[in-house]
Structure formats: structure tokens, C-alpha cells
Curated annotation (Swiss-Prot):
GO terms for biological process: DNA replication, removal of RNA primer; mismatch repair. Belongs to the RNase HII family. Its EC number is 3.1.26.4. InterPro entries: RNase_HII, RNase_HII/HIII, RNase_HII/HIII_dom, RNaseH-like_sf, RNaseH_sf. This is Ribonuclease HII. Residues 74-262 form the RNase H type-2 domain. NCBIfam families: PRK00015.1-1 (NF000594), PRK00015.1-3 (NF000595). Its main location: cytoplasm. One of its GO terms (molecular function) is manganese ion binding.
Amino acid sequence: MSKRLSIKEIDALLRQGDASIDETFLAMLKADERKGVQSALKRYERQLEKEKALWMEHEEMLAYEKDLWAKGYEHVAGLDEVGRGPLAGPVVTAAVILPKDVQLPGLTDSKKLAKETRESFYDRIKEVALAWSVAIVPVTVIDEVNIYQATKQGMMSAIDQLSVNPDALLLDAMNLPLSLPQQSLIKGDQKSLSIAASSVLAKVTRDRYMADLANRYPEYGFERHVGYGTEEHLAALNAHGITPEHRRSFRPVQETAATRQTS
């Protein structure tokens, strides 16, 4: 790069992470007196720091997997659920087995990710995973056995559906009646990459389910609150009553049903 580049050209190179960027080039930019060059350089350095932090977090979130891999457990499945708290809709569970060379920087608890980022990870996880599965447990089962047992059933089903048999499990605050070695981690979707991956698959699947439900019952606003007991949802329950997708074993739904029967 012998000729003096314009600020626009420099900014484009830095934004693209061009292969020609080396220590010599960066030293040249630091010595450049133009304010626009210094602004572009600072932006580039901030981006590098951000990427470095993401990779550090990525390594930290593989600590549990690496420990199990080192002990000879080749196929470690992470499991998580989405939808235990809502008044309507299913609880969705997912299981994911990641390869040892997995690269998913930025992946964390699905609730902390923007929708577009979550959707992107959803596709990427399915591409790179050794195996993945999703189980949807309907309202009828939730009402029959309770939400905790329904969640367990969903996780067992997700494990059964995996195309690769896991030999160890990482779970988000759950224990399953299985002989497989398993670790239950509080806030596991923030501590384990495998659990975080399963939380993304579960959440995207459930959000899409609730969006479809919103088309069937547009007056309830399911596309916004996804079944949780928000003010909007409770008002819709009082105004329109209970749908087949509402959990009759949950108190706010029971109270709505009782109120409408006596009115």
C-alpha cells in the first residue's frame, strides 16, 4: 500500500477486515494525522476488542463440555426448555450435541439475543450440530401432569429423537430419571454453549408456534406476549374467554373461567 489511501478507502478496508491489514499498516494509520482515519482506526480497534470478548466468552461457555470431552464423553447433549411460565401455548424443549471444533461466538441465553440474531443462530446451530432435536409438549399434557413433569417429558422426548445417542447431558436446572451422567446448571443457558444452543432452538420454535397461534386467535396478541400473563393478555382473556391453547391448570386461566361462568 504505497499510495496514500483516502479516508473512505481506509474505512472500507477496516470494516471488511481486509487481509492486507497488518501491524505495518496499522502503525501507518496511527501516524496518519487525518481525524477521519483516527476515527476509523478507533472503530476498528473497538470491533477487535468486541470480537476478542466474544471468543473469550465462547471458550468459557465450553468449559463444561471440554471437561466431559476430556473424560471420554464424546457426545455431550445440552438441553433446555422455553415456555414454562406462560398461560397459553406449549412448553418446547430442545437437545443439541455440538462438535468439539464448534465455532459459535456470540451465542448465549436465547432471551438475551435480538430476534434477528436468534434466527441466524437457529439456522447456524442446525448446520453445525452433530445432532439436534425439538419436542413440543402441548397444553393438554401440561394440564394433565403439571408443567414441571411436562417439561421433563419434553426433555426425555428430545433425547429420544436425537440421531446420535448422547453419553452425557448438560441441563438447565433440571434432573432427568436417566442413567446417563448429567449435570444440572443454574442459568445453564449462560454457562454452557450446548445448553445455549438448545435454548435458541426451543425459543425460535415456540415463538413461531405462537405467531401461528396469533393468526388463529388475533384478538389475544399472542405474537407480542407469546402467552405470558401480560396486562394485554389478561385483558383479552377477560374479554374473549379461554381458547383451547390456554392452560386450564394455571390459576389466572382458572380465575377467568370461573368469572365468566358466574357472570
